[in-house]
């Protein structure tokens, strides 16, 4: 039996997030995509919020992920702590409830990135906890052209120190206990790595600041420099780390691809563009959001009460040396 679906902009004037509802309670999300090819509709809409589709458990969400995915992805080369709750399903970033997570494209610092990201609101927060969505092409248009041009020319270099102290250990980040596996991964993914001790790994990777969408070919702001940059930390923490470690041993940092420091005011300008472009909407328990990870970015607002939002990554997008030269060393 075929069901009817209603697709409309979630908010007037913000076409990059559409709300999908169904006429009957037995309609399913996977049936919707049997009539609307996922790649085509996401490249047009950006993100789809499915509401009222009786997704109540992680296992149901996992089954949906496996149906929709051409290829599932695991969280390797991790940036944050997560727990696996079902096949292909993870907790959202485990970060203090009172803090904001700035909008970003998932794993944009990696060479191979998720083409799509799926969220499931297992339990919406009592207050706050929204997942804002921003159109990455609008973010790009809001950043001064001189700044964009410099990033196009120089790229971004992400620097990390894994020593099990302030940030993740290398074992957690790369999901292995074997140094050889880390080294193999780094070679395969254009990452320079250096062992400073048995427990201390330093990495450096050169990436582009923008990326063209594989289908519509639009250029998108696509990076995580504002999350890696030292100014993402609160001032007292930043000052303490710089005093004790210096720039070279910071847990994470981002500089121009040339090695030059990115001025704080440039990073602040980029953060302001991300905030200006975001669309904020409240979760309802059972909501499923399916987004094109290159077209749109996401974040998290502070919250009160219990909040459980799951996430899955699917359909890897591989770099093109011609279109994205900084994806190669």
Swiss-Prot record:
Q: Keyword Oxidoreductase on this protein?
A: yes
List cofactor names only.
Fe(2+)
Organism, as annotated: Enterobacter agglomerans
**Catalytic EC class:** oxidoreductase
What Enzyme Commission number(s) appear in the record? 1.-.-.-
- What are the recorded Gene Ontology BP terms? antibiotic biosynthetic process
Name the InterPro entries for this protein. AlphaKG_dependent_hydroxylases (IPR050411), TauD-like_sf (IPR042098), TauD/TfdA-like (IPR003819)
| Function of the protein | Involved in dapdiamide antibiotics biosynthesis. Catalyzes the alpha-ketoglutarate-dependent epoxidation of the covalently bound N-beta-fumaramoyl-DAP-S-DdaD to generate N-beta-epoxysuccinamoyl-DAP in thioester linkage to DdaD.
Q: Quick one: which pathway?
A: Antibiotic biosynthesis
Keyword Membrane present in the record's keywords: the answer is no
Q: Which UniProt keywords apply?
A: Antibiotic biosynthesis, Oxidoreductase
Q: What name does this protein carry?
A: Dapdiamide synthesis protein DdaC
An MF annotation (GO) of this entry = oxidoreductase activity
